Amino acid sequence: MEDMDTTITLIGTRLAKEGVEFFFDGDTPECEQCKLKNTCMSLEKGKKYRVVKVRNNTLHECFVHDKGAMVVDVVKAPIFALLDSKKAIEGSKIRYQAPKCDEKLDAETYELCYPKGLRNGERCTVLKVMGTVEMEADPSITLKKVELLP
């Protein structure tokens, strides 16, 4: 994943460490008055990112982050999800469709059925197929746990 497109942005100093992953939630009213707003808002709202490089140790004043912000390079981070086994082929490009999951799920399985940062119809690449998950309510449905890159 080293050849992925990087984006330069600002992030709170507490998160400005290589390998840290986060979801970008968009701007706040405090951002309106900031001269660096356009750099911060270069990310896509609701998407998951990973810090791949801290550019320098220059601390920038930030109205949102109490300890300031730093310049970092980020890439979109993979998302773990459940996928119909017929679509779970490593390297394939798909349009994500959330599977029909049992109503009574444990928290981990629920998060895989309805992953944050991924919308139905969104294009993504299946990076890795990690195993089979069977739904108790309907044994005919076979799902695979996969790593997807939107």
UniProtKB/Swiss-Prot annotation:
Name of a matching Pfam family: UPF0179
Source superkingdom: Archaea
Family the UniProt entry places it in: Belongs to the UPF0179 family.
HAMAP family assigned: UPF0179
Protein name: UPF0179 protein Mbur_1033
Species of origin: Methanococcoides burtonii (strain DSM 6242 / NBRC 107633 / OCM 468 / ACE-M)
